[in-house]
């Protein structure tokens, strides 16, 4: 059975991963919007 400590570690790792994924998505989305019109 999974313990409380294992569940806490798993949820923290998952939360950090999702947060970094959202930050990376916004960073890429913002940069591609600025680079696109300049290239044309």
From Swiss-Prot:
> Please, which domain of life does this record's source organism belong to?
Eukaryota
Look up and give the organism this protein is from. Drosophila willistoni (Fruit fly)
The UniProt transmembrane annotation reads: 5-25
**Which segments sit on the Lumenal face?**
1-4
Q: Which family does it belong to?
A: Belongs to the OST4 family.
Q: What is this protein called?
A: Dolichyl-diphosphooligosaccharide--protein glycosyltransferase subunit 4
- Give the matching Pfam families: Ost4
GO BP, sorted A to Z: protein N-linked glycosylation; protein N-linked glycosylation via asparagine
């Amino acid at each position: 059975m999974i313990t409380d400590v294992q569940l806490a570690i798993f949820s923290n790792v998952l939360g950090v991963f999702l947060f970094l994924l959202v930050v990376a998505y916004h960073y890429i989305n913002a940069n591609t919007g600025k680079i696109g019109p300049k290239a044309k």
